[in-house]
């Protein structure tokens, strides 16, 4: 970085330079280096040329062009005094409003005082006859935009580093009350040390942006509130910062694929710009903070510096980063990042493999302790166990061993079923108690269970990530597999309930088996051991001989009590053995498992049956008859159980004699032989035989004559006997019919067969689906073409109707077979001749959208839009509106709904359906539609207007004219609110940011309608006011309509609305800028029928709340700077009191704007700086001289200097009439030589008469103020400034005197500039009357000082 120089451009010429040296030679010397030649060659390729010498830049030599913008170019330059390389931004004066030039020069003087490592230093300015040259610090490595253009996209880490520095610079600017307004990659410059600097702040906001509502500059980075002309704030810079992040990450800003106007439209309409797909969650969160739509909710730069992404990127809490990223490292990281983006996916695959190695799956963890030789009953059990196993964190637990002696295989298999309880008595209370007692549970106290903080509790339970896990697979053992399998295998004839008492108990710990040396090793049971067999075999419980079964049951009943005691004893011994071992390491595991077993036992016993309670005598009878067991395998025979009923004679309990007679209940009397029934059965059999024969004769090999006879006979039989439908289906007649339809060309055969098909499938979705599956849809759809007769097409339409209204499946198959094209073809028929076909098409398309299937409606819209379906549909709408009746209204509603669905589809569909002919036809028929359907169609138009690419089609179809007329005609109808809601939204979308459409709406009379809506309809006010306020930004035609409808007075009345006062004041300022003289005159008028502009401004500033007060200061200070006469009317105590209360606002931007407003009022007043003392603001402004914000400090100091200068000269004590007297002493020669007023020369007597006439009036008329203010004010953009308005008595002399006084007042503000004649050359265009007046005043001041 080159060192900064504090020397201004007014430094003396260097002695080594030859004043008359040609510019070309100097350029040659500057361009001798290789880098300079390369830059020069690049500039030549880009069409850039070096700047011409500017005579006023006497201390600088311009070099090559670094870049071009909308308002000027930036050149590299060399300071001849210091050798420092600087950047010079040349702005053409012709591109600047004259009212802004002086403000820009004043602001540069303020911005020179700003100094921060992350902002570009302003060094001054030099004004020439054609350009304004702003001298800036030079950053040698260019912008981030150029780096991204040369090297590709930035990685997130580097963007975070750069954004950290940008936020530091932005925070400094915001603390100083400066809004950047144009943050983007091209305005973020870099140095070789990796330091980034914000450029083009302050002055950039004056020279770029929206000029007369046209897009100039960089719209892709603009915040929504800036586009909507609501005023830029510090939050607007945060939005632009988010767009810059996307620009660096993606290489392009948001919406870069769109033209500027559509991009602006999308920025305002979308919730937020599209986020980069590959961005990390932290970056996406950062962007969402930046893209808050409401600027009041948007985060500040100070808070963004604390965002995790920025903190992680910088890892520093200091205000200025201590060590910056080197430029070469930054470029290298960008190159490596883009190479990684372009590389194949092998790296990603390698990374994935490495992650798998770091986190091995659970299968490896389970098999790590498994020996190589394992004997299992079945390989399926191991696969299942491994598949659903969970990873073990430390030691492997095996619940199977915990239940080794508790649960026998027989306990896990269901016992046999018995008829009376469906469980065969094997799950009675005693049997359940016996099974429950086998788990070896010992009753433990609750205190032992409730000892928490068990580190192994989670290992005993299934993990949350593996909900299917229940019992882990046991570690295998190298043991005598044959022995253990013979003892415990699942294939034994009888599964033992538990091991004998002398069997060693072998618990599991840490995946290793602890063996008893005196006992044989027992192999662990696989999970399949406890799996219930799908084929139920209960041969161990049920014997072929019932005597054996009875003995077993009696034995079970006798030994139940002893078994329970024995099992309990064994379970206690098991628990004691396990507890004695586990006390060393994990004493809580056994207790926890035992308590869980105990709780399971209690729960099972709650639901156990009691055989003593099994008394069904109330159902089976009091005799206690016992049922014999069925001999079947399943043991369940529903017919063996009969309820006890009152009809005992027919009951099986009372009538044992008929038990062996299976036909006892069928002893009904048979009727005598019915002759008629026999004839009917015989006729039906012959009919069936006939139909089957006809169906069998339907072959493609038959002659067409024969096929014609067969089809006619079949149709006749089917019409006479509809029940033959099932016969045709059972005879597989559908396929032969389809084959003949596909090949036959005789239309009579086709018609007969189509009628048969429609009759068969009518209202039978199963047959329809079968027909679809065998390919019937495309065959029958073929007959819907226009080449076939009307009768055949009607049958095809009937088939189509069945397809789209029966089921979702048939609809999907109909669409997949090209059915939508058939519907569109029906729509294209003539409504008069083929009304039925057209209505089938309308109802078909409506049914397609109404059926709730899996296919999105957008897909249907896209398919139909390819066929331009809305064109014939709009024609049908016109014909339907000509009819009356319920059917016509239903069809009208369905057509409106179809249009509305198309407007909700994707943008591509909207563009395809927005044809001028369709829109024109729809808009034409709007008035004839019923109110409900009219609102639906207006929603269709509104949705189309939300897409920028459809606005031209809407304009070409006279949408604004039709909608304005419809709004006018429905203003007194009950549905006006709903209609106006849609219309105002549409007109707002169309007129926003487009002058031609704004003028079109104004010419169609939208302005008085909107004004009426604002006064009467409160909810609709929010839709009408944006359109009205935008009218001030339109051209001459729109403003002419505003003048005709008192638009300026309407804007003034809006200043009392806290929600719209900022927008209204901005509209007044824009209007004043366009038509300065006329608007100023009306603003200065005092009328009895409306409040004055001055009173409205004072009331607005006095009553406005916090946010509204901050936002209104920016347009107000612009307006006062543009019109000093208006500013002079605001020198009021109540206004200064309110400004004094806000001078110590927390935001530097508010304090700075307040000081600017006070400065504008003081400059326009006769008392100048004396107003500060008069209204008690002097002390408050003195305190601001020590403000932390540099610009506030500097502005306050200049105001204090103005006040002190005014006091020293005593101007505040001079009366206004004394000053007028001195003005009248100007010699006639000087007056004759003045060239400011273009008025005829009058005699001295007329001048004197005018002077005395004006002197008699203590307050000059406002019209005279307005006229005098025009002398040195820039003309409006509509044309040259009108002539000077004369005084009240029509004399020009009084006007001329007021001109001189206005000039003196305005010249006093020049003193705020540095008193350097070199800084502002004499080439500044001023009227000749200014210089004599200024010299005379200076002499008068010198005399007073002496």
From Swiss-Prot:
UniProt: ATP binding residues: 66-74, 89
Known catalytic reactions: L-seryl-[protein] + ATP = O-phospho-L-seryl-[protein] + ADP + H(+); L-threonyl-[protein] + ATP = O-phospho-L-threonyl-[protein] + ADP + H(+)
Gene Ontology molecular-function annotations: ATP binding; metal ion binding; protein serine kinase activity; protein serine/threonine kinase activity
SUPFAM superfamilies in the record: ARM repeat, Protein kinase-like (PK-like)
Presence of keyword Lipoprotein: no
Record field: compositional bias (Basic and acidic residues): 35-50
Cofactor(s) listed in the protein's UniProt record: Mg(2+)
InterPro entries hit by this protein: ARM-like, ARM-type_fold, Kinase-like_dom_sf, Prot_kinase_dom, Protein_kinase_ATP_BS, Ser/Thr_kinase_AS, Ser_Thr_kinase
Family of the protein in this entry: Belongs to the protein kinase superfamily. Ser/Thr protein kinase family. CDC7 subfamily.
Name the UniProt record assigns to this protein: Cytokinesis protein sepH
Gene: sepH
């Amino acid at each position: 970085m080159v060192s900064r120089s504090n020397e201004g451009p007014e430094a003396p010429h260097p002695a080594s330079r030859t004043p008359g040296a040609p510019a070309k030679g100097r350029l040659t010397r500057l361009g001798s280096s290789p880098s300079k030649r390369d830059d020069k060659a690049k500039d030549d390729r880009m069409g850039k040329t070096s700047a011409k010498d500017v005579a006023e830049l006497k201390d600088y030599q311009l070099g090559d062009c670094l870049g071009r913008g909308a308002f000027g170019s930036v050149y590299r330059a060399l300071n001849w005094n210091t050798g420092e390389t600087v950047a010079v931004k040349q702005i053409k004066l012709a591109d600047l409003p004259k009212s802004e030039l002086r403000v820009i020069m004043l602001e540069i003087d303020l911005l020179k005082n700003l100094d921060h490592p992350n902002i570009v230093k302003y060094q001054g300015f030099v004004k020439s006859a054609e350009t304004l040259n702003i001298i800036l610090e030079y950053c040698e490595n260019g912008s981030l935009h150029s780096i991204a253009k040369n090297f590709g996209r930035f990685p997130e880490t580097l963007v975070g580093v750069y954004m950290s520095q940008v936020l530091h610079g932005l925070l400094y600017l915001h603390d100083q009350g400066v809004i950047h307004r144009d943050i983007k990659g091209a305005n973020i410059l870099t140095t070789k040390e990796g330091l980034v600097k914000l450029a083009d702040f302050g002055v950039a906001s004056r020279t770029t942006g929206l000029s007369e509502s046209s897009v100039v500059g960089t719209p892709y980075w603009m915040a929504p509130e800036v586009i909507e002309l609501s005023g830029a704030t510090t939050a607007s810079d945060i939005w632009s910062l988010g767009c810059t992040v996307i620009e660096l990450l993606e290489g392009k800003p948001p919406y870069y694929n769109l033209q500027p106007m559509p991009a602006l439209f999308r920025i305002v309409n979308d919730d937020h710009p599209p986020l980069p797909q590959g961005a990390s969650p932290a970056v996406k969160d950062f962007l969402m903070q930046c893209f808050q739509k409401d600027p009041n909710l948007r985060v500040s730069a100070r808070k963004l510096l604390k965002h995790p992404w920025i903190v992680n990127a910088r890892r520093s809490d200091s205000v200025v980063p201590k060590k910056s990223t080197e430029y070469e490292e930054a470029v290298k990281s960008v190159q490596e990042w883009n190479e990684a983006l372009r590389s194949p996916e092998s790296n990603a695959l390698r990374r994935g493999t490495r992650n798998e190695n770091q986190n091995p799956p659970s299968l490896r963890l389970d098999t790590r302790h498994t020996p190589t030789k394992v004997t299992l009953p079945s390989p399926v059990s191991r696969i299942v166990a491994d598949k659903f196993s969970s990873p073990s964190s430390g030691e492997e637990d095996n619940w199977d061993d915990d239940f080794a002696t508790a649960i026998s295989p027989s306990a896990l298999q269901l016992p046999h079923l018995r008829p009376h309880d469906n469980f065969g008595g094997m799950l009675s209370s005693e049997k359940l108690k016996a099974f429950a007692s086998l788990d070896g549970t010992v009753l433990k106290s609750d205190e032992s269970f409730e000892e928490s903080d068990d580190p192994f509790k989670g290992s005993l339970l299934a993990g949350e990530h593996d909900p299917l896990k229940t019992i882990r697979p046991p570690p295998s053992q190298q043991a005598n597999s044959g022995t253990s399998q013979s003892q415990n295998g699942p294939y034994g004839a009888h599964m033992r309930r538990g091991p004998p008492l002398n069997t060693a108990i072998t618990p599991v710990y840490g995946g290793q088996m602890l063996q008893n040396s005196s006992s044989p090793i027992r192999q662990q049971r696989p999970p399949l051991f406890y799996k219930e067999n799908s084929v139920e075999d209960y041969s161990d419980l049920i014997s072929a001989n019932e005597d054996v079964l009875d003995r077993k049951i009696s034995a079970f009943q006798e030994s139940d009590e002893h078994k329970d005691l024995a099992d309990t004893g064994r379970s206690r011994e098991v628990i004691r053995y396990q507890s004695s071992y586990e006390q060393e390491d994990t004493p809580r595991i056994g207790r926890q498992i035992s308590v869980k077993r105990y709780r399971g036992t209690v729960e099972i016993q709650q639901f156990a049956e009691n055989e003593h309670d099994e008394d069904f005598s109330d159902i089976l009878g009091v005799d206690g008859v016992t049922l014999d067991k069925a001999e079947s395998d399943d043991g369940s025979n529903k017919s063996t159980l009969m309820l006890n009923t009152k009809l005992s004679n027919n009951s099986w309990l009372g009538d044992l004699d008929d038990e062996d007679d299976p036909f006892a209940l069928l002893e009904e009397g048979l009727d005598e032989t019915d002759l008629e029934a026999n004839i009917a059965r015989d006729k039906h059999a012959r009919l069936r035989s006939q139909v089957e024969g006809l169906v069998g004769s339907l072959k493609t090999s038959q002659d067409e004559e024969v096929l014609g006879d067969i089809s006619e006979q079949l149709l006749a039989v089917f019409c006479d006997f509809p029940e033959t439908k099932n016969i045709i289906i059972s005879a597989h007649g559908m396929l032969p019919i389809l084959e003949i339809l596909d090949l036959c060309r005789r239309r009579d055969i086709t018609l007969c067969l189509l009628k048969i098909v429609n009759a068969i499938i009518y209202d039978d979705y199963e047959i329809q689906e079968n027909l679809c599956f065998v390919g019937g849809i495309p065959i029958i759809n073929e007959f819907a073409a226009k080449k076939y007769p009307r009768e055949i097409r009607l049958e095809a339409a009937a088939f189509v109707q069945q397809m789209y209204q029966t089921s979702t499946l048939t609809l999907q198959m109909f669409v997949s077979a090209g059915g939508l094209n058939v519907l569109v073809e029906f729509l294209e028929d003539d409504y008069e001749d083929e009304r039925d076909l057209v209505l089938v098409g309308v109802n078909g398309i409506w049914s397609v959208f109404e059926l709730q299937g899996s296919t999105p409606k957008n897909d249907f819209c896209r398919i139909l839009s390819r066929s331009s379906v809305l064109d014939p549909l709009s024609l049908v709408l016109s014909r339907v509106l000509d009819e009356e009746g319920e059917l016509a209204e239903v069809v009208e509603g369905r057509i409106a709904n179809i249009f509305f669905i198309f407007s909700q589809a994707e943008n591509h569909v909207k563009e395809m359906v927005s044809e001028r002919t369709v829109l024109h036809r729809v808009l034409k028929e709007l008035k004839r539609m019923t109110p409900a359907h009219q609102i639906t169609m207006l929603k269709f138009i509104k949705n189309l207007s939300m897409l920028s690419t459809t606005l031209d089609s809407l304009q070409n179809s006279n949408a604004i004219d039709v909608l304005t007329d419809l709004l006018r005609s429905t203003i007194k109808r009950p549905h006006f609110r709903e209609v106006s809601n849609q219309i105002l939204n549409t007109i707002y979308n169309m007129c926003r940011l487009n002058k031609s459409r704004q003028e079109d709406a104004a010419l169609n009379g939208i302005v008085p309608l909107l004004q009426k809506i604002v006064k009467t309809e409160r909810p609709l006010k929010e839709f009408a006011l944006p359109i009205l306020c935008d009218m001030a930004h339109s051209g001459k035609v729109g403003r002419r309509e505003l003048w005709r409808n008192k638009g300026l007075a309407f804007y003034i009345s809006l200043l009392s609305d806290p929600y719209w006062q900022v927008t209204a004041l901005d509209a007044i300022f824009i209007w004043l800028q366009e038509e300065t003289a006329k608007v100023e005159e009306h603003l200065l008028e005092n009328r009895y029928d409306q409040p004055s502009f001055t009173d409205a401004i004072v009331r607005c500033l006095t009553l406005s709340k916090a946010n509204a007060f901050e936002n209104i200061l920016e347009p107000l200070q612009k307006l006062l700077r543009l019109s000093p006469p208006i500013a002079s009317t605001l020198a009021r105590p109540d206004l200064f009191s309110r400004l004094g209360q806000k001078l110590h606002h927390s935001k530097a931007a508010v304090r700075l704007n307040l000081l600017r407003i006070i400065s504008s009022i003081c400059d326009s007043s006769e008392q100048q700086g004396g107003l500060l003392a008069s209204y008690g603001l002097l002390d408050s402004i003195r305190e601001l001289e020590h403000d932390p914000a540099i610009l506030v400090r500097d502005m306050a100091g200049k105001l204090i200097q103005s006040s002190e200068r005014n006091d020293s000269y005593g101007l505040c004590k001079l009366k206004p009439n004394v000053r007028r007297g001195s003005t009248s002493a100007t010699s006639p020669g000087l007056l004759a030589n003045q060239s400011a007023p273009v008025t005829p020369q009058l005699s001295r007597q007329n001048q004197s008469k005018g002077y005395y006439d004006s002197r008699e009036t203590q307050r000059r008329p406002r019209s005279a103020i307005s006229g005098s203010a025009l002398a040195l004010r820039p003309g409006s953009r509509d044309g040259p400034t009108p002539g000077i308005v004369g005084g009240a008595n029509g004399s020009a002399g009084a006007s001329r005197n007021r001109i001189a006084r206005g000039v003196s007042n305005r010249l006093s503000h020049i003193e705020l500039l540095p008193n350097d004649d070199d800084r502002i050359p004499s080439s500044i265009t001023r009227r000749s009357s200014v210089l004599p007046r200024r010299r005379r005043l200076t002499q008068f001041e010198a005399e007073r000082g002496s």
